[in-house]
A protein has these predicted regions:
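Conserved hydrophobic/aromatic "anchor" residues
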Residues: 22, 60, 85, 124, ...
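Acetyl-CoA-dependent GNAT
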Residues: 5-84, 92-97, 101, 105, ...
Length: 158
């Protein structure tokens, strides 16, 4: 598995994976996804299967960060893994890279929302040190509940 930063030619495969992984109202629009990726205060990581000439996107993660008066905070916008590639450590590695990007940008904490029914994702976040901080009843297009999880980030690893 190759992990690398997003490149402009990745968008079609990235959005095809978005459509495969999420249905409305959870799925992001193309315009919103482009906006997230273009944000200079964000990082998008790609997990790519490299079988000779055939490269396929196995997953991706998008993290953003914002400077606030009490310090920079980060937010995991999404982590998505192709169904055929799940349970193989890809999401954990994408999460690690997203955290490293946020840490390098000065973030001292990282937050995310997760569908209350996404047991696999909840298990991953808990195993990586995230703690539930709340629940929003009408988060996903005001139709579905989500848990709020957060984790403190230490200083960048030297």
């Amino acid at each position: 598995m190759l992990y690398r930063p997003y490149q402009p030619g990745d968008f079609a495969a990235l959005y095809a994976l978005e459509e495969l992984c999420f249905q409305p109202p959870i799925r992001y629009s193309r315009a919103w996804m482009r906006k997230l990726i273009a944000n200079p205060n964000s990082a998008t990581w790609i997990a790519e299967k490299n079988a000779g000439e055939n490269k396929t996107m196995a997953g991706f993660a998008i993290v953003e960060w914002t400077a606030l008066p009490k310090g920079t905070v980060a937010y995991i916008q999404t982590i998505e893994v192709h169904p055929a590639s799940r349970r193989s450590g890809i999401a954990a590695e994408l999460l690690r890279r997203a955290e490293d990007s946020a840490r390098a940008a000065g973030a001292r904490s990282i937050w995310l929302h997760v569908d209350v029914e996404n047991a696999a994702a909840i298990q991953l976040y808990r195993s990586r040190g995230y703690a539930q901080r709340g629940r929003e009843e009408h988060y996903y297009a005001r139709h579905r509940p989500a848990f709020v999880y957060a984790k403190p980030l230490g200083p960048p690893v030297q």
